[in-house]
Amino acid sequence: MPSPKELAAGLIKYAPGAVDFGHGPRFDNPDQPKAEGFFGRIPLSNGDYATEYSVSQNIDGKNVEMPSIVPTLNKEELGHVMRAAETGSPLPNSVYDKSLAHAKDRISKGQSPFWQIPESYTPMPK
């Protein structure tokens, strides 16, 4: 897996300061690319991979896009997200709850809900 510095060397194709990781644009803001996510690229059984699996939730009356793959997920919850990424199956409420709590915490610190360079990757849940 590449280091954050190696990832930062990627070509900028989007808004100023946005690094293109090759995952396509965000659904709610096509000027911003999807990033690597807190766990990096997670392989799926279909040969593809997931990095963020974004969801939208309401924060203070605004619809906010955020990753459902967050460091507070346990192994079972991460498995549900991976299945949803492959099949479109619904996510359990616990994933939405943790995604929302994680996003609110990061926003309160002036951070994006999403992983950003130069953050380190989070170890996978066991």
Give the residues covered by each predicted segment:
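Charge-dense, intrinsically disordered terminal/linker segments
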Residues: M1-K126
